[in-house]
Amino acid sequence: MKQFKRLMILSFAINAFLISAPTHTYASSTDVIKSEKTATRLNYIDTETIPYNKSFNDTKVGGLSGISYDAKSKKWLMISDDRSEENPARFYEAQIHYNKHKFNKVKFTRMHYLTQANGTKYPNKASYNPHSQDVVVDPESIRIDPLNRNHILYTSEGDRNLGFNPFIRIASRTGTLINDLQINNPIKKDDQNKYEFRNNQALEGSTFSENGKYIWTSMEAPLLQDDQLPTTESGALTRLTKYNRQGDVITEKAYSLDPIPKKPGKNKDAENGIAEILTLNQKQLLVLERATVQDKNSNFKNYIRVYKVDIASGTDIKNIKSLQKSHVAPVKKQLIANLNEQDIGHIDNIEGMSFGPKLPNGNDSLVFISDNNFNQKQQTNLTAFEIKP
């Protein structure tokens, strides 16, 4: 209970900071190039591997779990899910060039630390003071704000053990906190440990709506009160949530996760969940499902599928706290790519997804990024595809 009293004090302090902060003007939706794209399949272009020992601006490059492209500046942003263990929580700017055949250039150009309301960097678990207003962050997704390209959105998965809820924050392009969305739907932790998000399986994906007015997020795994985790025999229901910019839930849909595609070795691990989402158009999202299966020798294999989802379909569940005893219809989904069925070589722990520049033939491109977990046995890969409309 002390943790939750501290959270309330922390929330009050952040709100006080934000109220006293200068206001920011946004472009009108008519000034924004609406994201209206179509997709029927993905054609592989190329993969570029970032070396494990890559460093930049005295930080270790790794754990890259989110990626976002700014078509106006032609810059790419990549966020690390480092919980300030290797270096303080941060994101990178980069130049990434590719054509319809191959990657030509990947160059890191800037690094920015993410900061808290008091202007300090996020602490790690070891240095965190539970009597302070500090937060231990677990960054996952990053998006450039289409209504103000000097701003970014990023998500954190929270930490049940420390009493931190998942959050959605708006920051400057240099990492300074601007706004903290006061999300109030049932993803938040209760004080009896019976409900809400699972540790390290919470706000994994985010995307702005096609007009930039709204924010969609995805839960990697079902809430505790919604469903069991997927197995090799059955899938599970998780949530896609649409917020306005004040953090109010506009609509929420159930998403049916696939069963785990392969049986793990005896007493080994396996999971499947949503790794990222991306707005395709007014009616559809792309959803990236990632399954990880450990074999008998403790080796992990990743299974990556990309679905096109009809967000107008399915039951609106925003007022349903638990899905277990509710008869709800999930959104309709259509497979457009199974990366394991394409000849793309090694598939690592893909967590991020972003549209890139248009290709010379006018088709859109899509880039995935994998999170190496700061593990020398894993790879940080950028993988590019052509989107066939």
Outline where the language-model segments fall:
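Sequence/structural signature of beta-propeller domains
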Residues: 22-389
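Sec-dependent N-terminal signal peptides of Gram-positive bacterial secreted proteins and lipoproteins
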Residues: 1-29
